[in-house]
Amino acid sequence: MKKISRRNFLLASGVVTIGAALAACGGGSSSSTAASSAAPASSAAASAPAAAEGKVLNIWCWNDEFQSRFNDYYPEVKEIAADKSTTTLKDGTTVKWTINANENNNYQNKLDEALLNQDSAADDDKIDIFLIEADYALKYVDSDYVLDVKKDIGLTDSDLAGQYQYTKDIVSVDGSQRGTTWQATPGLFAYRRSIAKEVLGTDDPAEVQTYLSDWDKFNDVAAKAAAKGYKMLSGFDDAYRTFSNNVSAPWVTGTTVTVDENLMKWVDQTKEYTDKGYNNKSSLWDSQWASDQGPTGKVFGFFYSTWGINFTLLGNSLATPTAEGGKEEVGNGIYGDYAVCEGPQPYYWGGTWICGAAGSDNLETIKDVMLKLTCDEAIMKQITMDTQDYTNNEKAMEEIAKSDYKSDFLGGQNHIALFAEAATKIDMSNAGPYDQGLNESFQNAFKDYFTGNVQEDAAKANFETAIKEKYPELTDVVWPA
């Protein structure tokens, strides 16, 4: 298998020039949440693991989602530090957590630096496990810094048989699977029941879906919602994934960037929604976007995949956050006022994969973590029952889909049934290593167009400038005719 070179590995992160790549990397950031400040110290591909298991398991991620899954569901956990910086396993192994936020490529930048320095680091300072997202998965799995989950770590086809195929395909190169995940991330449209009743006369998911089953109908509902004083969407980015996940080809072929026609449909729709007041001009993750999901919000709905329901939307719906003593129950904010339907197009959003780092001296522990947290049917089912996350086991999800399971947050709806149907429609064939950077640059470039600060041609030019600065190896940009 042809791996990404060290130079191009750095370039794919979008933050270094050729000169910087050749100079490698400097020190780490003091903002890192890490129990150990020592950084690995030289470039490396795979190194032979030590015969004996290490006493420290270093795990890198960008938020506390996997940390919570690990601490709550990995059977070998014995003790968790009060500040959660470390977890102690029953065999005495210390798990050290390094958490660097995702914004502006921060997580990837620091991870890349550490991986390039992996080979000469002390054993207890080497990265053992790191997490990756769908938008940049290929950058890592098509490199020498990641272990094959079967050949190197020891998982079998039988172990992985219950998982959704797309979750294996996206982290596979030339037949080598180089990551595994506990979750599948099909997307749905989450809407406010109370607003749907006022605008459409019903809050029933099946009936609401008939009004939202294609983009023309969706736009009609946006007009009806506006007439009632509501926004259809919160901001510029909300519908983006439904368009970007349905493109006809990857972003990049060779060194040429091709802007898919479907992305320009998103531009046209978002410009129309902004001009007509169908959105609140928010951006993904900003305070307005979060507020629009809460008790004072007047937004019809949000495009969310599986993790978004339980990890983001639920929290934003509460008047009193759980951190302030609030409970996840009807009566706290608008808990119970959301429901979900398929929406106008199938899509996915995100997903987190566990990778074993080349050079780790904890292969048996990595194997056990992967087995328990991504392959164990009972654990997968329990995670879903407890958290409403959609886990990566087809049999377990089908059982819940066909059961009397109900989500109190979604007004008694069994949303797992809809996710189970949507999961089979996920197509990751056009995913590529530049996706995160190009998607972010595209969205950012057109915000000035949506708000009327620049014309469309200027937004296109700004996109081209941004990506050539971020990825100097990309030479051309082709727009739809």
Question: Where are the regions a protein language model picked out?
Answer:
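Conserved N-terminal structural module of periplasmic/extracytoplasmic solute-binding proteins
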Residues: 3-5, 10-138, 157, 381, ...
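Hinge/lid segment of periplasmic solute-binding proteins
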Residues: 40-48, 119, 132-188, 325-340
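Extracytoplasmic/periplasmic substrate-binding proteins
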Residues: 67, 71-76, 265-368
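Periplasmic-binding protein-like
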Residues: 69, 193, 370-400
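Helix-loop-helix "hinge/cap" segment bordering the ligand-binding cleft or interdomain interface
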Residues: 152-159, 168-239, 251-284, 358-364, ...
